[in-house]
Amino acid sequence: MTANNENVKTSESASFESAGPNESEKPIRFASATLGAKRHVCAFFNSPDEEYRVLLPFIKEGFERGEKAFHIVNPALRKEHLRRLESVGIDTDAAEKDGQLALRNWEDAYLREGRFDQDKMLALIEEVLDEGKQQGFPLTRLVAHMEWALEDRPGVNDLDRKSVV
């Protein structure tokens, strides 16, 4: 997950949507913090090992609670991401089959039609969150790898102009 910038190796964004009032009251742990009612985290990591040391407990907790997981990953690291999830006891095959785990590559999320379009990305997130509710999951945890934003990609400068989430 090494990006072009030597000081920023990996970045993640995590957001959540609850399906019911009781779910929004449950504490959610991320690293050494408890997240409040409005939950969004942007984290930068120095290495993949550091990234997964922080993310895996957070991800596993969601699976144990029966929450949906939506992960956007570097396509070159998809298999490694699944291996890391499996290393903490998550049955990724079963989770994908029953809809608890949904994985998308950058090109199928951030970079649809070959460029970043913030409005389309936000529409996708809304769609995924609504889908999680319709499937009966109490909460959807979104983990999104953002290293692509450090590359020269069409639309990447729109991240600087617009600030949403």
Each predicted region: which residue ranges?
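Long, charge-dense
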Residues: H81-I125
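Short, compositionally biased "basic patch" segments
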Residues: M1-E12, E17-L35
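A conditional alpha-helix N-cap/helix-loop micro-motif detector
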Residues: P48-Y52, Q118-L122, L159
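Short acidic, S/G/P-rich loop/turn micro-motifs used as interaction or catalytic elements
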Residues: P48-E50, R78-K79, A109-R112, E131, ...
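Flexible, compositionally biased loop and terminal segments
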Residues: R29-A37, H71, V88-A102, K133
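Glycine-rich P-loop/Walker A and Walker A-like loops and their local beta1-loop-alpha1 context
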Residues: A37-L77, H81
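Conserved small/polar residues in nucleotide/adenosyl-binding loops
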Residues: V164-V165
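Elongated alpha-helical scaffolds
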Residues: K120-A123, E127, Q135-A149
